[in-house]
Amino acid sequence: MENIKRIYLSALVHNRTGVLLRVAALFARRGYNVVSLTVSETESPEFSRMTIVSDVEEYKISIVMQQLSRLEEVIKVINLDEGQAIQSEILLIKVHALNKDRKKVLKTINSFGARVMDIGHTTITAELTGLPSLIDKFIDKMDKHGICELSRSGVTALESGDRNIKEVE
């Protein structure tokens, strides 16, 4: 089996209808699985930033980047190595919390620095923002209480330091 690597790509694209479809279609046609995808308008409304997380065979990383760069709507693509990127993700999670368990659930929520968003009769909903690894650990802990449902935003990332995507060659 080939050496699979998780890659974090940041793409600056024109903010136009159909761009997301073209990027997703490229990944689907090539058989690349998208683990996480976030898209949002940038500081300039004419552009959007896509953060694409994918598990790719190591030798295909540059190929994926070249294929993305060839799309007309894509202005620039950079590979955000973990050490060179600021990453964050948001989790909303609803867990079972009967009266006898509420203190334990709240203690777990507080120990991770999460926020309580809602308390129902039998559930507690919390929000946690942080690295994907922190989100994963929190989910593991909350699983002991019984997860009703959860939603993850997907990873969003920027290059660390002073450079920005427009300056990267």
Task: For each feature predicted by the language model, list its residue ranges.
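Long, contiguous binding/interaction regions
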Residues: 1-49, 53-169
